Amino acid sequence: MNEAHLRICASPEWAAFVESELLPWVLREQDLGDEVLEVGPGPGLTTDVLRRQVPRLTAVEIDERLARSLAGRLAGTNVTVLHADATALPFEDGQFSAATLFTMLHHVPSAALQDRMLAELRRVLRPGGLLAGTDGVETPARRDLHADDDYLPVDPATLADRLAAAGFAGATVEVQEDRFRFAATVPA
């Protein structure tokens, strides 16, 4: 994540948006269960909201500096932070009741790696487990914000098929203006 993007994702304005609009929209009518995995929390503003809603939360961040900072800030809470690559998760099969991806999928640098990550999430979710997330629709402003950064926008029109190919069932994708939310489950 480049520095300009990181400043936005760590800002009080983004924190307010995440808490009042983004997470309530993505998680509306979703049961996350008792053991939740968050992939790509960045500076952790989504983690701050999510940890108040679930008993146990594990956050996986590929950026070592961000993972270390978040782990230090959330030490002693119900959150475990790991520096790890979500395309090769260090967890047992079926360990989590739910997994979340909040505005991070576009940072995975290739469609093949995005699909590998989705398959890994399928692997670590229990039967009946939920995958829920959101990402932005590609716009010139978003492309500019990601200058000198990994940026591979996901086409919401193809995401349900990609989730099915990864082993998920019942995928839904809803576009709202410049963003979309998605959800799918692991077959029981």
Residue ranges and their predicted role:
Residues L37, G42-A88:
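Class I SAM-dependent methyltransferase SAM/SAH-binding core
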Residues W14-D34:
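Conserved alpha-helix/loop element of class I SAM-dependent methyltransferases that forms part
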Residues C9-A10, W14-A15, L130-A183:
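C-terminal alpha-helical "lid/dimerization" subdomain adjacent to the S-adenosyl-L-methionine
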Residues T100:
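A conserved beta-strand element that flanks and buttresses the S-adenosyl-L-methionine
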Residues T103-H107:
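Short catalytic micro-motifs in class I SAM-dependent methyltransferases
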Residues D115-P127:
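A short glycine-rich, Lys/Arg-flanked "PGG" loop and its adjoining helix->strand segment in the class I
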Residues M1-L6:
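N-terminal, positively charged/glycine-rich alpha-helical extensions of SAM-dependent methyltransferases
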